[in-house]
Amino acid sequence: MIIRSPEPEVKIVVDRNPIKTSFEEWARPGHFSRTIAKGPDTTTWIWNLHADAHDFDSHTSDLEEISRKVFSAHFGQLSIIFLWLSGMYFHGARFSNYEAWLSDPTHIAPSAQVVWPIVGQEILNGDVGGGFRGIQITSGFFQIWRASGITSELQLYCTAIGALVFASLMLFAGWFHYHKAAPKLAWFQDVESMLNHHLAGLLGLGSLSWAGHQIHVSLPINQFLDAGVDPKEIPLPHEFILNRDLLAQLYPSFAEGATPFFTLNWAKYAEFLSFRGGLDPITGGLWLSDIAHHHLAIAILFLIAGHMYRTNWAIGHGLKDILEAHKGPFTGQGHKGLYEILTTSWHAQLSLNLAMLGSLTIVVAHHMYSMPPYPYLAIDYGTQLSLFTHHMWIGGFLIVGAAAHAAIFMVRDYDPTTRYNDLLDRVLRHRDAIISHLNWACIFLGFHSFGLYIHNDTMSALGRPQDMFSDTAIQLQPIFAQWVQNTHALAPNVTAPGATTSTSLIWGGGELVAVGGKVALLPIPLGTADFLVHHIHAFTIHVTVLILLKGVLFARSSRLIPDKANLGFRFPCDGPGRGGTCQVSAWDHVFLGLFWMYNAISVVIFHFSWKMQSDVWGTISDQGVVTHITGGNFAQSSITINGWLRDFLWAQASQVIQSYGSSLSAYGLFFLGAHFVWAFSLMFLFSGRGYWQELIESIVWAHNKLKVAPATQPRALSIVQGRAVGVTHYLLGGIATTWAFFLARIIAVG
């Protein structure tokens, strides 16, 4: 740590009234661009309007102005999030069976939407138990509400109103910090101050206040609920906060107040700050006292982290110093210059954040089933499947977004004249080695993973099961994965002696946890079938990375097009007269990467859905006999391509295909409609622009004949626009099809 002279005093970092609020300005379509503001000559205008409305780089090159627009837009985004949350809570308050579910969560399914009878669609209101008819929801809101200690629909109402207040505050803040008091560029670039405030404030105090809420409100209320007390009899949240004796009845150490804390006798608090591991056998969720302990610990860590960076005092870390000191034996100048990149290119900053947040989202997807955090979440199979699928898709999109913004940074913000021999320059200089090796890895994984399946299909077709790769013939056990499982299962005795059980039951070693006759979680066995599909995961992920990374590393130049940087982020081809140069722009790599991301995530959610139905989810009899939903057929059926088609896609689609005339029929309609949206995308992806332009001109001729031709000249979509429309429908159609397939299946059988 370098001791320096004190930093100068805090400067004024806002401009007052920089931009006047003008409704006339906002009412003029395309006011942000001279060209678009002129109004439409051709139908391309409406596409350009949408493409450029939020491309702030194209409005101005002034970094301060761009930063202010992004900052203001973030408040708008937060406002929409609060509005959405308010809607969720309002539905819980007004249209749901939350109070009934709270009294009997094992027999009543959550519902928060009742369909009005207009043309007979009240058939969708299925019987969810307890005499309530509505649409079964799978968002996990009921479980999170119970965990946070909400016991009545009135409380949900109040929270919904609170969220609306916050939404309007955010809207106001977005306007205020752009039109009235806009931060200067220096404020956006003050990374040490930003780190301190975000770490100590958002994460530190945020976690601390949540831990406080969990200890003083959630824990006692959940204690009463678990003991079967009627929610209406339970004291209200503020009573626990104001009256310490109430808490002391449940947790005697509360009577001693803060004394054990200051006398370092912290073990006294172990009643409500526990370190148990495993699941609560009553609710099938993590121990709420473990979760409170976790948030308290996280809060301490982040409060410390939020005091590590040098701001107005001559003490603490400077980010620039840390980055410039970061040199390795093969990295030349290392991270020299990275500080300048990340404080002047928001695309570079965003790219890193998206990559990390995307990875984190996928980690969350895996924790939601392996360590279900909320009460009764683990036995609500529809919600389990939905949460996993949702977080996997979101994670995939965020990671593709990371590559997109990395490529935009390369094209728009990277300055090769000032970047010499730093880490990024070194990566760019050996990009051919990186991409060709990655390509080899993809070929290897593709041929070998599919080769194993094709071998099995062939042997199966020829009636030679003894020659197949399977747990009962030629075994390919995932020994490394099993070793990882075993290590974690033994951790409580070895590496984590303070814990009573391992972090998750899926590692093995424990007894299964069942709640209300349904399996919450049990040790998940891994075998040859998982080994095979795992290599398909490896293959699809590597191909996605190959496409995205090639797009980033060759965004500015390639042997084919040395001056690619001059053509911009998205362009269809390198002009007329140069054949074979289409689909090379950075944008096209994002476009192609999206399809492979879709492939990758689809295989993951199919694997998860079938594996859980086969080996985890099911019912348990009084004698302790477990009956799984698909009877453990994953290990033998999923080792052939034919098995995936026959026993997963076809067999499990029967519920959605046969849903007509039942309360699940909306899923049947969605299944059909989303297939149509998906197929519609192929029309955009498999035909050229010229075809449509010819057709349009013929149609315009007919309009001219009838004297009904519009003033705005119709144009076919540009090549890039066509691809954008195509990939959008492909992904939305595919995702909605999968959603209908999964939910109709799991609500019917789960």
UniProtKB/Swiss-Prot annotation:
It is found in: Plastid, Chloroplast thylakoid membrane. GO terms for biological process: photosynthesis. PsaA and PsaB bind P700, the primary electron donor of photosystem I (PSI), as well as the electron acceptors A0, A1 and FX. PSI is a plastocyanin-ferredoxin oxidoreductase, converting photonic excitation into a charge separation, which transfers an electron from the donor P700 chlorophyll pair to the spectroscopically characterized acceptors A0, A1, FX, FA and FB in turn. Oxidized P700 is reduced on the lumenal side of the thylakoid membrane by plastocyanin. HAMAP family: PSI_PsaA. The chain crosses the membrane at residues 70-93, 156-179, 195-219, 291-309, 346-369, 385-411, 433-455, 531-549, 589-610, 664-686, 724-744. Keywords: 4Fe-4S, Chlorophyll, Chloroplast, Chromophore, Electron transport, Iron, Iron-sulfur, Magnesium, Membrane, Metal-binding, Oxidoreductase, Photosynthesis, Photosystem I, Plastid, Thylakoid, Transmembrane, Transmembrane helix, Transport. One of its GO terms (molecular function) is electron transfer activity. The PsaA/B heterodimer binds the P700 chlorophyll special pair and subsequent electron acceptors. PSI consists of a core antenna complex that captures photons, and an electron transfer chain that converts photonic excitation into a charge separation. The eukaryotic PSI reaction center is composed of at least 11 subunits. It is a multi-pass membrane protein. It is an enzyme of class 1 (oxidoreductase). Phylloquinone binds at residue 692. Pfam families: PsaA_PsaB. One of its GO terms (cellular component) is photosystem I. It catalyses: reduced [plastocyanin] + hnu + oxidized [2Fe-2S]-[ferredoxin] = oxidized [plastocyanin] + reduced [2Fe-2S]-[ferredoxin]. This is Photosystem I P700 chlorophyll a apoprotein A1. It comes from Phalaenopsis aphrodite subsp. formosana.
